[in-house]
From Swiss-Prot:
Residues annotated as site: Transition state stabilizer: H150
Keywords for this protein: Glycolysis, Isomerase
GO cellular component: cytoplasm
Descriptive protein name: Probable phosphoglycerate mutase GpmB
GO molecular function, one term: phosphatase activity
Catalytic activity: (2R)-2-phosphoglycerate = (2R)-3-phosphoglycerate
UniProt organism field: Salmonella choleraesuis (strain SC-B67)
Domain of life: Bacteria
Family annotation (PROSITE patterns): PG_MUTASE
Family membership noted in the UniProt record: Belongs to the phosphoglycerate mutase family. GpmB subfamily.
UniProt-listed InterPro entries: His_Pase_superF_clade-1, His_PPase_superfam, PG/BPGM_mutase_AS, PGM_Phosphatase, Phosphoglycerate_mutase_GpmB
Gene: gpmB
Alphabetical list of Gene3D superfamilies matching this protein: Phosphoglycerate mutase-like (3.40.50.1240)
Catalytic residues (UniProt): H9 (tele-phosphohistidine intermediate), E82 (proton donor/acceptor)
Length: 215
């Protein structure tokens, strides 16, 4: 059985400003760096052998902090990038026009052909993150990889493993530096292939997440 751990990047400046990131970037906040350190402390006990990260700055920094803690090398994979949010990237959510908010809500509310102008669809996102995950099956026997990616990307990955369409309503919360685990196995009691063991674990973090504070 192959165990793969999934980690969302630490809190960023634009997360705190309620600004849409997508494939644009902003640095980790001090809290985000601390969150990544706490993931690293947890990762030391998980026997992680490989760290594979999105090549965007916020995930690279998160991966670097985790790698320092568990002594692993990092591989960067652009297929783990966040959903391309097109013309809405860098915009504050509260500044969107009614039309722009409608584009964004399509992705949240489950519109099959939803796409922000200039961006990508949820199906396109799903195809590439699943391809990145499939590459883990080529790692040496006994490997235990940890993937560092993004909220929408990882939410789409976990949801589609559970059998939902890529464009389904977003109902899975994966907070900054949450840890999820998926396993590849042959089972008499579960469908063969990828299964979800845990999703969105934040028990290793010692402070409330942004979405808890901004309610």
């Amino acid at each position: 059985m192959l165990q793969v751990y999934l980690v969302r990047h630490g809190e960023t400046q634009w997360n705190a400003e309620r600004r849409i990131q997508g494939q644009s970037d902003s640095p980790l906040t001090a809290k985000g760096e601390q969150q990544a350190m706490q993931v690293g402390e947890r990762a030391r006990s998980l026997s992680i052998t490989h760290i594979i990260s999105s090549d965007l700055g916020r995930t690279k920094r998160t991966a670097e902090i985790i790698a320092q803690a568990c002594g692993c090398d990092i591989t960067f994979d652009s297929r783990l990038r966040e959903l391309d949010m097109g013309v809405l990237e860098k915009r504050q959510i509260d500044s969107l026009t009614e039309e722009e908010e409608g584009w964004r809500r399509q992705l949240v509310n489950g519109t099959q052909d939803g796409r922000i102008p200039g961006g990508e669809s949820m199906q396109e996102l799903s195809d590439r993150v699943h391809a990145a995950l499939a590459s883990c099956l080529e790692l040496p026997q006994g490997s235990r990889p940890l993937l560092v990616s993004h909220g929408i990307a990882l939410g789409c990955l976990v949801s589609t493993i559970l059998g939902l369409p890529a464009w389904a309503e977003r109902r899975l919360r994966l907070r900054n530096c949450s840890i999820s685990r998926i396993d590849y196995q042959e089972s008499q009691w579960l469908a063969s292939g990828w299964v979800v063991e845990t999703a969105g674990d934040v028990s290793h973090l010692d402070a409330p997440a942004l979405d808890e504070l901004q309610r």
